[in-house]
Curated annotation (Swiss-Prot):
Regulates the gating properties of AMPA-selective glutamate receptors (AMPARs). Modulates their gating properties by accelerating their rates of activation, deactivation and desensitization. Displays subunit-specific AMPA receptor regulation. Shows specificity for GRIA1, GRIA4 and the long isoform of GRIA2. According to PubMed:18817736, shows only specificity for GRIA2 and specifically to the form of GRIA2 for which a single amino acid in the pore region has been edited from a glutamine to an arginine residue. Thought to stabilize the calcium channel in an inactivated (closed) state. It comes from Rattus norvegicus (Rat). The L-type calcium channel is composed of five subunits: alpha-1, alpha-2/delta, beta and gamma. Acts as an auxiliary subunit for AMPA-selective glutamate receptors (AMPARs). Found in a complex with GRIA1, GRIA2, GRIA3, GRIA4, CNIH2, CNIH3, CACNG2, CACNG3, CACNG4, CACNG7 and CACNG8. Interacts with GRIA1, GRIA2, GRIA3 and GRIA4. It comes from the Eukaryota. It is a multi-pass membrane protein. Its main location: membrane. The keyword DNA-binding does not apply. This is Voltage-dependent calcium channel gamma-5 subunit. GO terms for molecular function: channel regulator activity; voltage-gated calcium channel activity.
Length: 275
């Protein structure tokens, strides 16, 4: 991968991580995951009359119609004890939603840790392991979030299937924008995790590619030799020596490969004495 492509992928993963973290934070802190509406069907003209309407999040429920209009309560205390404005189906749905609450919180924690590690990895590119660890945290965050979303949906669907249907009443529900933010956050988080792991693999491969093999290094020839580098690369060794040294080395190598075949004969010493 080229340097430009790697930088673009790094920037894209950072943007996805920021958007995913922001959307999930908004989704967890707001009360627009689910809209519920209860009413009766008037037999005269088959019109409907809304008896209760509310929107709920992971922590609170706020009424939009009925005697409690404009008031919000926590999920544990859906409404005052003397109020009978909600049916058993609504109460059961709001109670079952609590089983899915821990998973978005765990997902938010994992996403925050992955975001911090990812930024540190971008600031210090030589620490390639941080990209891998942040990618793992992003993937775990996405898995935790999708488990929470599945539990949230299944809790509502189970209650709808077990609910006793009545021809005189109706019960409608729809998912709100907080739920949509959480779903989009899952897609962004998983994408950021996959890109972080991919960047780690590319950086690790590039490091292995440009790391010289130990066999390419030249060992020390002798302790008192001019070739004093114990692990000197051959190319650097050639570039670091002067032309005269290189020619001397070539002549020495030629003499060692082609020894002299003829030797100077030994002459007997001639005496100058007349005897």
């Amino acid at each position: 991968m080229s340097t430009c492509g790697r930088k673009a992928l790094t920037l894209l993963s950072s943007v996805f991580a920021v958007c995913g973290l922001g959307l999930l934070g908004i989704a967890v802190s707001t009360d627009y995951w689910l809209y519920l509406e209860e009413g009766i069907i008037l037999p005269q003209n088959q019109s409907t009359e809304v008896k209760m309407s509310l929107h709920s999040g992971l922590w609170r429920v706020c009424f939009l119609a009925g005697e409690e209009r404009g008031r919000c309560f926590t999920i544990e205390y859906v409404m005052p004890m003397n109020s009978q404005m909600t049916s058993e189906s609504t109460v059961n749905v709001l109670k079952m939603i609590r089983s899915a609450t821990p998973f978005p919180l765990v997902s938010l924690f994992f996403m925050f840790i992955g975001f911090i590690l990812s930024n540190i990895g971008h600031i210090r590119p030589h620490r390639t392991i941080l990209a891998f660890v942040s990618g793992i945290f992003f993937i775990l965050s996405g898995l935790s979030l999708v488990v929470g979303l599945v539990l949230y949906i299944s809790s509502i669907n189970d209650e709808m299937l077990n609910r006793t249907k009545d021809a005189e009443t109706y019960f409608n529900y729809k998912y709100g924008w907080s739920f949509a933010f959480a779903a989009i956050s899952f897609l962004l988080t998983e994408s950021a995790g996959v890109m972080s792991v991919y960047l780690f693999m590319k950086r690790y491969t590039a490091e292995d590619m440009y790391r010289p093999h130990p066999g390419f290094y030249r060992p020390r020839l002798s302790n008192c030799s001019d070739y004093s580098g114990q692990f000197l690369h051959p190319d650097a060794w050639i570039r670091g020596r002067s032309p005269s040294d290189i020619s001397s080395d070539a002549s020495l190598q030629m003499n060692s490969n082609y020894p002299a075949l003829l030797k100077c004969p030994d002459y007997d010493q001639m005496s100058s004495s007349p005897c």
